[in-house]
């Protein structure tokens, strides 16, 4: 399905190495890009408009890391400019981009979004709970 829309597929054959390995695979594959937008697949209420707003904020401030947030709580999607790729490539274990953001708080720009859009759903029970509260 991804190919139908012009997207490539990158498979992580070592998920046991943690989130950092997934980030490194994507970063290596897109190393020639000016920035990378990282997203997770378990935010069912994330709106396409939010992704567009995060991208627009990065276009306005391309030297900044841009992340969706609600009341100061950061989440995904998040865009990292190329200059941060080396730091993303050396993350280990289940460490994500937050480790890079913590080292560069002055370079972070957030886009305020509804809390529900940042909801991370990892289990059927979590999905049922989220649907219950909608």
Segments (PLM) and residue ranges:
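Conserved beta-strand positions that form and line the central face of beta-propeller blades
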Residues: 9, 87, 120
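Nucleotide and nucleotide-moiety/phosphate-recognizing core
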Residues: 1-74, 104-114
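Conserved alpha/beta core of the MobA/IspD/sugar-nucleotide pyrophosphorylase nucleotidyltransferase superfamily
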Residues: 90-134
């Amino acid at each position: 399905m991804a190919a139908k829309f012009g997207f490539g597929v990158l498979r992580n054959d070592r998920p046991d190495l943690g989130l950092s390995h997934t980030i490194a695979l994507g970063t290596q594959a897109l190393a020639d890009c000016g920035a990378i937008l990282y997203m997770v697949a378990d935010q069912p209420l994330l709106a396409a408009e939010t992704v567009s707003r995060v991208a627009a904020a990065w276009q306005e401030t391309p030297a900044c890391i841009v992340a969706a947030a609600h009341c100061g709580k950061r989440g995904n999607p998040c865009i990292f400019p190329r200059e941060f790729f080396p730091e993303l490539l050396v993350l280990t274990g289940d460490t994500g981009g937050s480790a890079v953001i913590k080292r560069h708080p002055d370079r972070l720009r957030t886009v305020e979004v509804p809390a529900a859009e940042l909801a991370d759903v990892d289990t059927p029970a979590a999905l049922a709970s989220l649907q219950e509260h909608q």
